């Protein structure tokens, strides 16, 4: 079974294989973005239209990943194309203030009013880096509390306990907390300023904030745990962090780079942080990052004040990204968010039903237009649960991913699923059918390698390929 799935993929994608070999002559392993590589080689994409992408062999796929949540409007949306092509004739990055900076900011503040003041950078990585620097400058403290398995980009502190294999470890500051696990290349001295806490564990957060509160500059959290498994925050968890950070005099930072598509989360649920980061959708398909929040905190950057915090960058707030982002925000409001919520709810319900119908233990998690699929009968509550659900199942997950590609669906190897606003409900249903067929076909493999995933009392049904 495993061999047939791989052979079908390789038979259909010889041009991608050739492209991968050529890329490897310039790029390590033929890759420049770790999340998009998978064995035996990734598809090389040459054209995108609407909700579909075409590979180098001419095959079209329904895009169910939306560039890891960075896109919302589909590919080549007419308004975004017009904004970018028009701005190209007026200048891309002129090296001085432009009206687009406050025009885009006004649009974004209308969507997220907690951004009383904001600044621009080039990515979510930069945005979270600057949010923490802002918190440290404002509080005069150094310690940062982050979620074990939380992903905040590729700067040094963001790569501590970020669901990547560590080269070395360090003990936690307090007993009972996760050990500190910096990724390769991150200094232990950097990791020494990080305290990791389990997601959705308010007692652990209370222990840290009450025990180390006077040293803590910020608590940084994703409202939905992203790379750590798509885990939603438990009811009351983020409100509890809000209360605890106020008591400790620390700033609460929401990393909403991925969860703007949910409303953003803070607006939908009414829990307001001190600082927020955004990226992905706000750039309309081009690189753009935002960090901002309380006016008194962001006043540290006011250049008319004595000794402002220095923040610069040749492409921060560049005109091209802001033009695309403004067009994207003009077409991203209540109706679009509600449609993404509808698609996500439909997808998760369908995936759970599909797994049950073929007698395979599998559960979907997520919120709104952000979903994950996991093997196992119980959905994860934190990143440690996600790690346990994935342990020893890398080949199974790879085979499921390749099966979906063979069926014409572009998804993420680690299970992330995101839709575009123009994605049709029928496309979601077709993806659910593809999952069901793939899981059915994988039952013999699962019976040999992962029998614990077969639900023996479930009367699975035969599924004919569409």
Show which residues each predicted segment covers.
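Conserved N-terminal phosphate-binding loop of PLP-dependent enzymes in the Aspartate aminotransferase
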Residues: 1-466
């Amino acid at each position: 079974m495993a061999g047939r799935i791989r052979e079908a993929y390789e038979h259909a994608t010889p041009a991608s294989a050739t492209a991968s070999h050529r890329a490897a002559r310039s790029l390590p392993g033929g890759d420049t973005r770790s999340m998009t590589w998978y064995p035996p080689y990734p598809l090389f994409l040459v054209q995108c239209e609407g909700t579909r992408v075409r590979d180098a062999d001419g095959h079209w796929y329904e895009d169910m990943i939306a560039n890891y949540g960075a896109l919302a409007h589909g590919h080549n949306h007419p308004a975004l194309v017009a904004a970018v092509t028009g701005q190209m004739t007026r200048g891309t990055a002129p090296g001085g203030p432009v009206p687009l900076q406050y025009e885009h900011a006004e649009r974004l503040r209308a969507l997220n009013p907690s951004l009383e003041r904001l600044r621009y950078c080039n990515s979510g990585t930069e945005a979270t880096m600057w949010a923490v620097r802002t918190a440290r400058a404002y509080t005069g403290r150094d310690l940062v509390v982050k979620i074990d398995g939380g992903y905040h980009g590729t700067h040094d502190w963001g790569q501590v306990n970020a669901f990547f294999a560590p080269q070395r470890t360090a003990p936690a500051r307090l007993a009972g907390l996760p050990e500190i696990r910096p990724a390769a290349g991150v200094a232990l001295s950097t990791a020494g300023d990080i305290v990791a806490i389990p997601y959705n564990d308010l007692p652990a957060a209370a222990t840290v904030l009450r025990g180390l509160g006077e040293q803590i500059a910020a608590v940084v959290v994703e409202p939905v745990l992203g790379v750590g498994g798509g885990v939603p925050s438990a009811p009351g968890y983020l409100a509890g962090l809000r209360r605890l950070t106020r008591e400790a005099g620390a700033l609460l930072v929401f990393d909403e780079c991925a969860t703007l598509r949910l409303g953003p989360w803070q607006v939908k649920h009414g829990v307001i942080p001190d600082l927020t980061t955004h990226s992905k959708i706000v750039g309309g398909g081009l690189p753009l990052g935002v960090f901002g929040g309380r006016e008194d905190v962001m006043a540290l950057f006011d250049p008319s004040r004595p000794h402002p915090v220095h923040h610069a960058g040749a492409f921060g707030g560049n005109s091209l990204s802001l033009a695309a982002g403004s067009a994207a925000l003009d077409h991203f409001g209540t109706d679009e968010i509600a449609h993404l919520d509808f698609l996500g709810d439909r997808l998760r319900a369908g995936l759970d039903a599909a797994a049950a119908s073929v007698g395979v233990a599998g559960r979907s998690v997520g919120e709104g237009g952000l979903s994950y699929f996991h093997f196992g009968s119980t959905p994860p509550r934190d990143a440690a649960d996600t790690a346990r659900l994935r342990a020893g199942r890398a080949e199974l997950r790879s085979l499921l991913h390749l099966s979906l590609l063979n069926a014409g669906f572009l998804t993420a190897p680690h299970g992330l699923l995101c839709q575009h606003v123009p994605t049709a409900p029928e496309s979601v249903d077709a993806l659910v059918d593809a999952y069901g067929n793939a899981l059915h076909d994988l039952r013999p493999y699962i019976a040999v390698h992962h029998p614990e995933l077969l639900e023996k009392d479930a009367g699975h049904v035969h599924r004919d390929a569409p």
